[in-house]
Amino acid sequence: MEIQFQQPNLQQHQKAGTKGGKFKGRNRNSNTNKFVGVRQRPSGRWVAEIKDTTQKIRMWLGTFETAEEAARAYDEAACLLRGSNTRTNFITHVSLDSPLASRIRNLLNNKKGNKKQEGVVDVGVDVDVPAPSASTTSTSSNTSNSDKNDHNSLSSGKVQNTMLFDDAYKPDLSNCKEDFQSCPPQSNFSWGFGPVFDRFPIAQILDMPKTDGMIDAASLELSEFERMKVERQISASLYAINGVHEYMETVQDSNETLWDLPPLCSLFC
């Protein structure tokens, strides 16, 4: 009875040992088939491919029957691209005359040519950018011409204004001066006309600035403004004197000898 119970246990241990041996064999085979830059297709053949991120290169090295052949192709391409210090699957000696070396050399030359063309395109763009400076110079010249035209129009307007001022009414004060000089010095006008003349500084008005024949437009415009100011003040003084004269006629007696004098308005006419 004891022997019958022990036999099933032995059979179970034997089955477990055979399963474990199978798993170990698979793991060993998978480890030996792993190479850098090599992968296996579903058909069973091996493919080698190399990538270089610094130079932006991805190169198909080909399809091989064994993983070792694909790994050696990868090692050769890696040494040509990155140098002898790169990571490889085997210790390899690169031959510069191999077809793979010529392929990699052509690929690198194409990459360099593309970079040079991109640099030439960039330089051309940089050279073409300053072209709008001509338009800016033309616009600046147009603005300067417009400013000159505006200045000329303003100066012509000032000249026209001065011509209009020349046609304005100018009172003649020659008779006023002659009548004032012909009046006797004994006459006293302190009875009511002193404050009137004090309000209108005619002496200051008559002192006009003496200018020569050659004057600029600014001084000419200023002299015209002063002349208009003088004319307005003189007309205001004449209105005030006439008003005082009429008031004195209504208040004072017309038989007084004072009113035998000529009208005061004739002094300033």
Curated annotation (Swiss-Prot):
Keywords, in A-Z order: DNA-binding, Nodulation, Nucleus, Transcription, Transcription regulation
Disruption phenotype: No visible phenotype under normal growth conditions, but roots of mutant plants are impaired in the interaction with rhizobia, formation of infection threads (ITs) and nodule development.
Locations listed in the record: Nucleus
GO molecular function, one term: DNA-binding transcription factor activity
Pfam family of the protein (one): AP2
SUPFAM superfamilies assigned to the protein according to its UniProt record, in alphabetical order: DNA-binding domain (SSF54171)
Region named Disordered: 1-36, 128-157
Gene: ERN1
Comp. bias (Polar residues): 1-15
DNA-binding segment(s): 34-91
Family classification: Belongs to the AP2/ERF transcription factor family. ERF subfamily.
Any single Gene Ontology cellular-component annotation: nucleus
Record keyword Secreted present: no
Induction remark: Induced in nodules 7 days after rhizobial inoculation.
Biased composition (Low complexity): 128-146
Protein name: Ethylene-responsive transcription factor ERN1
Job description of the protein: Transcription factor involved in the symbiotic nodule signaling pathway in response to rhizobial stimulation. Functions as a transcriptional regulator required for root infection by symbiotic rhizobia, infection thread (IT) formation, and nodule development. May coordinate these processes. Functions downstream of the CCAMK-CYCLOPS complex. Probably not involved in arbuscular mycorrhizal (AM) symbiosis.
Lineage, opening ranks: Eukaryota, Viridiplantae, Streptophyta, Embryophyta, Tracheophyta
PANTHER family named in the record: ETHYLENE-RESPONSIVE TRANSCRIPTION FACTOR ERN2 (PTHR31194:SF1), SHN SHINE , DNA BINDING / TRANSCRIPTION FACTOR (PTHR31194)
Keyword DNA-binding attributed: yes
GO biological process, any: regulation of DNA-templated transcription
